[in-house]
């Protein structure tokens, strides 16, 4: 199908670099994104054992400034943003008033009365409208900087080792969720010790016009380019939810294992989140047959839920899945997943499926 101007896919600042590297491109959240380069398993293994880099420039960035910035963020999120200090980051949610999520997000404290919020690519417009609606009266200025920044995620146990010779900051002194300015290959960037793979790593915020040069330099020092395919298998092994799968406008987020996000404070949507979750998110492992989103989950022959994400785990060597099941069925051990009309045994297992050594 030919893309019309109205449906044309957006491109990140690294689009040409992906094509040069032979990436297979696919539509994702309205963007033309690399799903793989050399191959999913090789890219996955590189991140688990060494270092890989992802283009996540499709993510959105909003700057929140003003004397009311903290009060505003406390109002729109359930985690306690007052715990942040300049140079620190925090995982958080944007709840709606119906017991679901507008999005799951990261908040970075830049300085006094100034924060950066990173949101999922497919939710940029929705999140922006939601925040604009709730901002009235808080004395804050919201700026959508999504087109200003490119975002690269250098992930893996050797991420710090490969970056250290090329930055002017001691990376060893930076703890998880640190956020700090640096010079990388001579370019001004902000680095965050955050990621979505279950490994150590750094996310690089850089001016969109300079991103391709930095990407090429990362290629030159041997960092493996990795696509959305490996990003998904890595995050699933680590038990990380993906918006649109484990979280959504109509999925109670406290069905997940992320109950720690909600703190005892007032926030928009709190009353709806206080209603008990009717489902629970569980981990499943299977012997041979990979399962996909939407496949029915059965217990004693009865449908009790569905798969939200599934893959064949490159690290573990067998299929794994996250599934939403009825709360009353969640404590059982033995389930089945229906694949093309046939039920395959599945065993509930702890999440995360994989933890970095």
From Swiss-Prot:
**Reactions the enzyme catalyzes:** N(6)-[(R)-S(8)-aminomethyldihydrolipoyl]-L-lysyl-[protein] + (6S)-5,6,7,8-tetrahydrofolate = N(6)-[(R)-dihydrolipoyl]-L-lysyl-[protein] + (6R)-5,10-methylene-5,6,7,8-tetrahydrofolate + NH4(+)
- Which family does the record claim for this protein? Belongs to the GcvT family.
What is the name listed in the Swiss-Prot or TrEMBL entry for this protein? Aminomethyltransferase
Q: Which UniProt keywords apply?
A: Aminotransferase, Transferase
Gene Ontology CC annotations of this record: cytosol; glycine cleavage complex
Q: What does this protein do?
A: The glycine cleavage system catalyzes the degradation of glycine.
A biological process from GO? glycine decarboxylation via glycine cleavage system
HAMAP family annotated for this entry?
A: GcvT
Instruction: Give the EC number(s) under which this enzyme is classified.
Output: 2.1.2.10
Q: How does it assemble?
A: The glycine cleavage system is composed of four proteins: P, T, L and H.
Q: Report the Gene3D superfamilies cross-referenced here.
A: Aminomethyltransferase beta-barrel domains (3.30.70.1400), Aminomethyltransferase fragment (4.10.1250.10), Probable tRNA modification gtpase trme, domain 1 (3.30.1360.120)
NCBIfam families referenced in this protein's UniProt entry, alphabetically = gcvT (TIGR00528), PRK00389.1 (NF001567)
User: What InterPro entries does this protein map onto?
Assistant: GCS_T, GCS_T_bac, GCST_C, GCV_T_N, GcvT/YgfZ/DmdA, GcvT/YgfZ_C, TrmE/GcvT_dom1
Top-rank lineage group of the source organism: Bacteria
